[in-house]
A protein has these predicted regions:
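Mg2+-dependent phosphoryl-transfer enzymes with acidic/Ser/Thr/Gly-rich catalytic loops
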Residues: 122-177
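Cytosolic catalytic headpiece
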Residues: 1-123, 130-133, 175
Length: 177
């Protein structure tokens, strides 16, 4: 089959739409329970995504994350540093973010004294994984995400996040004795 990259307006005639193709990336079955347990242990959960706001809000609702505090990448672009510093404190959902905006948000949270873990699996997550205190990826992630992560989850169950928090706190407590 020859590849022909020369297209003209004339080529776009007598076309008939035969359907749409949609992709769904639903949350893992354990996500809602894992998030509930993280909340119970005092861990704040935020979504930083390049996806659109409709998708991000739908996923957040499914896993039990508050959808009332929401910012888009475009809104962030139009904010000054002071306003953004204040906004990231309470915002739980961020959509249509660029890779640089993800990194910026993590950095601002760290400046406020937070220890930030970031879970990502795509090319656009590499910078955020590096910037975070604990970069977490999954075994099926793209290579650059796995290389940028501190931890790679081998299980498909997000409850290991709770286990990690509890073990980390035990270790920290033992070190400080």
């Amino acid at each position: 089959i020859e590849k022909d990259c020369n297209f003209a307006i004339e080529d776009e005639k007598e076309m008939v739409l035969i359907g749409y193709l949609a992709f769904l990336d639903p949350p893992k079955p354990s996500a809602a329970e894992a998030i509930e347990q993280l909340y119970a242990h005092g861990v704040a959960v935020k979504i930083l995504s390049g996806d659109n706001d409709v998708v991000v809000k739908a996923i957040a609702r499914q896993v039990g994350i508050d959808t009332s505090h929401f910012l888009t990448g475009i809104e962030i672009e139009n904010m000054d540093e002071t306003a953004l510093k204040e906004a990231v404190k309470d915002t739980t959902l961020f959509s249509k973010l660029t890779p640089l905006q993800k990194t910026q948000i993590i950095s601002l949270l760290q400046e406020q004294g937070n220890t930030v873990g970031f879970l990502g699996d795509g090319i656009n997550d590499a910078g955020a994984l590096r910037q975070s205190d604990i970069g977490i990826s999954v075994d099926s992630a793209v290579d650059i995400a796995k290389e940028s992560a501190d931890i790679i989850l081998l299980e498909k169950d997000l409850m290991v996040l709770e286990d990690g928090v509890l073990e980390g706190r035990k270790t920290f407590g033992n070190i400080n004795k």
